[in-house]
């Protein structure tokens, strides 16, 4: 009842609709604070990722900003503006949900303190740093800033949940680490590959590792269990788990500085300084200039948009397919476009008129298979939107709606 004027968009065009399915993608026009309250009953505790790029606070007046909002806030006004929205947004997050907020230097410390108040300091994860431009401002004779910050909090921090960053190369790595406590590890027969001659190697201390029993090597493998003592990274339990997963070990010299090698590369956590390559060698995490070129090629009239690749970096790291992603400062629609291409359900909100022209136009191009941004790296190929189940790209549609007039009238009266 809080929303009205529903229109569904799919590969066949625009259609009026009165039905809203549980997994529909939503684009909502209206005051985002009221929209968040309107969404709370249905989506409380269901959103996996909130990704926002709000209007920034600046120390000095700016002629405009990304979203055509008034960016010349007094600090206190801006903080109240953000606090009201972050408090209700927290209710929408799932218990393992994550919120990311872009910000520049002017207000990063104020925003961090505000988010600690709302999400609690213990749930802070990281302030990621992204190089947002290849052409930093040259007006200052003190420094040339070329980065933005993305503050990350979890609703309830969970050490067992790992974010996905870049994949490591499938090379061997040392099992020894200087400074670790010395302890014994037992390596099962056949799990160590030796690059030294076959034969019998007596117990002793050739270097940093102590051989606690005699070792017999045949055809490049240990034919008996090997007991070693050293400053190892792993416990016996972890070693046993790794062996069961196919990990093997390598001894390259008579010093017996043992190394491990997994059968395939592993996924590391994202780094604080965002890597410029992660999707592919051709398409990495780009800059605002990349976003401008992409939008221009689509005929979208919008300035200061984020590239799809930086949004995709976090969507990939922190969500799985069909998780819900929320952006209540949608702007040109980058978060929605990325979520659509990566098969996440999304809710996008904005109050500006460009949502009906630029944002909807962009999302229609995505539905038709637009190949800019991250499309080629992901091999984005949308399928027939009539297939609502059982297909990876079956959710190739979105529903546009507006805040009901009674709610919007209240906003208009307050702003008058």
Model-assigned labels for residue ranges:
Residues 131-139, 345-352, 412:
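Short beta-alpha connecting loops at secondary-structure transitions
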Residues 17-38, 364-406:
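S-adenosyl-L-methionine
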Residues 34, 56, 330, 353, ...:
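Short, glycine/acidic-enriched loop or turn micro-motifs at the edges of active sites
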Residues 82-83, 111, 116-117, 128-136, ...:
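Contiguous mid-protein beta-loop-alpha structural module that forms a pocket-lining wall or clamp
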Residues 116-121, 130, 155-159, 341, ...:
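Short, well-ordered loop/turn and helix-capping segments at boundaries between secondary-structure elements
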Residues 409-416:
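Charged, amphipathic alpha-helical linkers/stalks
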Residues 1-324, 356:
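Class I S-adenosyl-L-methionine
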Residues 71, 75-79, 108, 308-384:
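Conserved S-adenosyl-L-methionine
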């Amino acid at each position: 009842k809080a929303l009205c004027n529903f229109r569904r968009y799919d590969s066949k065009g625009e259609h009026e609709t009165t039905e809203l399915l549980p997994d529909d993608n939503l684009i909502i026009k209206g005051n985002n604070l009221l929209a968040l309250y309107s969404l709370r009953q249905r989506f409380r505790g269901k959103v996996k990722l909130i990704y926002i790029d709000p209007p920034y606070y600046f120390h000095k007046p700016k002629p405009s900003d990304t979203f055509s909002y008034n960016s010349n806030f007094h600090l206190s006004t801006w903080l109240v503006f953000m606090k009201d929205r972050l408090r209700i947004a927290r209710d929408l997050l799932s218990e393992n949900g994550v919120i990311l907020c872009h910000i520049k230097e002017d207000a990063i410390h104020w925003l961090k303190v505000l988010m600690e108040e709302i999400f609690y300091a213990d749930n802070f994860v990281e302030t990621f740093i992204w190089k947002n431009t290849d052409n930093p401002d040259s007006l200052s004779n003190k420094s040339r800033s070329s980065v933005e910050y993305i503050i990350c909090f979890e609703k309830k921090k969970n050490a067992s949940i790992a974010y996905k960053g870049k994949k490591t190369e499938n090379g061997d790595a040392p099992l020894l680490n200087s400074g670790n406590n010395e302890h014994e590890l037992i390596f099962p027969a056949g799990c160590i590959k030796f690059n030294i001659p076959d034969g019998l190697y007596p117990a002793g201390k050739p270097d940093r590792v102590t051989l606690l029993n005699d070792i017999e090597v045949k055809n490049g493998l240990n034919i008996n269990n090997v007991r070693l003592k050293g400053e190892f990274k792993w416990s016996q339990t972890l070693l046993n788990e790794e062996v069961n997963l196919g990990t093997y070990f390598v001894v390259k010299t008579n010093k017996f500085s043992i190394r491990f090698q997994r059968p395939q590369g592993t996924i590391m956590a994202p780094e604080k300084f965002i890597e410029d390559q992660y999707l592919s060698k051709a398409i990495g995490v780009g800059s605002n200039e990349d976003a401008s070129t992409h939008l221009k090629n689509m005929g979208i009239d919008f300035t200061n948009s984020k590239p799809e690749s930086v949004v995709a970096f976090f969507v990939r790291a922190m969500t799985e397919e069909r998780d819900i992603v929320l952006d209540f400062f949608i702007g040109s629609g980058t978060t929605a476009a990325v979520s659509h291409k990566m098969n996440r359900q999304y809710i996008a909100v904005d109050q500006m008129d460009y949502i009906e022209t630029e944002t909807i136009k962009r999302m229609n191009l995505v539905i038709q298979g637009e190949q800019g941004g991250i499309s080629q790296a992901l091999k984005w190929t949308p399928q027939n939107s009539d297939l609502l189940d059982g297909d990876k790209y079956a959710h190739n549609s979105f529903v546009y709606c507006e805040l009901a007039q009674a709610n919007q009238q209240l906003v208009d009266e307050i702003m008058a």
